Amino acid sequence: MATSPDSGKMTFHSTLKRKLILSMLLVGILPLLIGLVMAFLQARKEIREVNGASFQALAVETGRKLDLVIKEEEAKTRRITLDPEIIRILEERRDVLLDGDEATFKDQLEHEQEAWIKKDPKFLQPITQGPLAKILEGHYRGTISEKDLSFTVVTRSATRALYITDIMGRLMASIHTKVPYTNKEASWWKGAFNKGIGQTYLENVAFDNLLDTYTFSLSIPIMDSIGYQAIGVLHRAYDAKEFFAPSIDIIGFGKTGHVMLIDSQGIVLSCPLLPTGKRIEDARVIPLVTPRHPGWAPTPSDGHGGTETSIIGFTPLPSVSRITQQSTGTAWHMFVWQSSEELYGPIQNLFTWIAVFGAISFGLLITLGSISAGRIVTPIRRLQAAAKLIGKGELREPIVIKTGDEIEELADEVNRMNQQLESAFKQLKSHLASKTAEVQYLQESTIQI
């Protein structure tokens, strides 16, 4: 099937123009895309590192302050164990128990346990209102302590239990009755008494059925007058949320950024969002945020139920963790978190703007490329049409192209070529006419002869 000249022109024009536009796009858009992608990746990296370093610094500072708060609380509580009257009464109790008969003591303990459960007023009175109880109450309320050594309002309010046991774990004094009478088998008692050697025991957060709340406890051995042997244990239980909240809940940034306290098993001790006692759902996060050194890490989830990647700053509480490691084998860690949506919001906005800018640039390149290609293709088309006319000998006027480049020079060369062809054709016609005249003359001469 024949193709019309116009169709050929359009095919040539469309193909060349398309190639020129495609070449311009490749030359222009590839470096642009590479630059934009590199800028986005670098910005993402910078934001992640800046946020990570900031989260780490916040975790370290908050952890340091909370570490000091707990150390101060431990020091103030330990002062109760140094009270001479408490030591005297417990030494007397020790001597009685060591000199007594074990079977008799066992029977007596059963009766006392029964009386405690039944809340016998005569039995409760010496424990909750006796000399030791009054000393405890005085220290608890700050009436017998120096002002700078008394418990703060916050820790006093967070205290849920404060009591003393003897060398057998039996209750000697308490500020109320919502505590067990026998404690010898309790892990905190075994750890603090430590077979008579004595050591500070800091228990992890757990739900206390008697106190009906999540608590952590501090247990300190009461040593005899020469500091040689433990003669009892002072046990203090705190409402975990109420104790930690003043140091943790007040720290926030952005809409969701906050700090929280967890142990090395991922149990939440205090958090403005998660309930105390809850375990972090994603177990993959726990080892990433509970090393023995401060730092920050990208995590597969945010530790708060979200599944998006996040950045978490962390640090152990050094002094407190030394005690908890000896006590329960776990450490306490400060954890700084912000929702993934808010954390990566600036990056997503940056990506959106980069995509918009890239789309606009792509459109501009197509538009400018089309205009530029048209300016190149149009004079070439004129030259193509002129070449066809020259082939037919029909080009009567010179080609006028003013592009100021090689195409204009090519048009001038085509004009010169056309002039030379016309001159050659004229000479050829003149020569042909001369030869034709000679032939006619010879023919006429031949006829006459």
Label for each model-derived stretch:
Residues 129-250, 302-307:
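Extracytoplasmic/periplasmic ligand-binding sensor regions of membrane-associated signaling proteins
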Residues 388-389, 402-434:
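Amphipathic coiled-coil signaling helices used for dimeric signal transmission
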